[in-house]
Amino acid sequence: MLNFVVIFTGGTGGHVLPSVSFGNYLIDNGYKCILITDARGKKYTNQFKGKVKIINASHLTGRFFFKIIGLVKLFLGFCQSLLFLLKLRPQIALSFGSYASLPPSFAIKVLKKFIKLNFYIHEQNSIIGKSNKYLIKNANRIFVNFEKDYKLQKKYRKKIHVVGMPTLIKNKITYNSDLLLKNNKKFTFFLYGGSQGSIPILKCF
């Protein structure tokens, strides 16, 4: 099928929500798009307009036993992804990072030996995550959010393209300068954190 894109994502909203936004953009512009994620990431996909495929995935953290369990889940996710992608045969695959993107991305690495497709990475953070680092070698392009030095080897730097962050927010957020001036005698500061850091930061205050 022409114009068929699969997107790999998972874990936290920081990975999933931008992928949902970009996937919806593709669908609105005539592409077929399927999202592959894990059970944890699925809760952020309610606004996605296409099909969502759930696979097994896990972090490799904790004690030895839990790392073994994690490896088993990643292998199962790889097998699920390989069978699913063999059936679909997309032209384009795009990873938005997280541990859940590893199984389908490794499946793409295998499939690229037999079918023609392009594989891309989008990195949302100022430091490239572990999952995306593993995949850089096999990526045709690396899309990033910030214009900065990502400390990559010279042979990979030419793959980088600054595109910014896909977002579900349609309207710009503006501040009320009059409100700030009314309270100019009070010391005011703004706290902002990601999905893993915002609650702990706010609890400190």
Which functions belong to the PLM regions below?
Residues 40-43, 90-112:
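An aromatic- and histidine-rich active-site surface loop
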Residues 2, 7-10, 25-73, 163, ...:
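Conserved nucleotide-sugar phosphate-binding/catalytic loop shared by glycosyltransferases and other
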Residues 2-3, 91, 185-187:
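Nucleotide donor/acceptor-binding cores
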Residues 7-20, 199:
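A short, glycine/small-residue-rich beta-strand->loop->alpha-helix junction that serves as a flexible
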Residues 5-6, 81-100, 117-122:
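Short N-terminal targeting/anchoring amphipathic segment
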